[in-house]
Amino acid sequence: MERVGVIRSGIPYDSIEVISRRLNNPVKSMLAIVGIPQTTYNKKKSEHLLLDSRDSELVILINELIDYGLEVFNNEEEKFQRWLKKPNLSIGGSTPENMLDTVTGINEVKFSLNRLEYGNLA
């Protein structure tokens, strides 16, 4: 229940920079995934405001997905980052990275990682 409270309260805007660094992607790319215009991000970050609950949940789930992906790839960041950018048949030929803009997409990527971890096609 604490997690729900954190999501409802919101997390800092600069948490987008954290996942951006972890994925070795420009902040601009992460803003596109989360659906926040650069100008809005800059303004709200400078005012130390918090992400709304939807965006907070996405950022938290993406961060957890990164943790899981690194675990599956034995902490080999480059391999995991490459995997995120390659089309994947288990998610309809899309790249995992393109699925990160919705909770359902994140879950599909997580299922794909799970299949990979346990030796099924991913």
Question: What are these regions, as identified by a protein language model?
Answer:
Residues 1-122:
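Non-transmembrane "mature" sequence context
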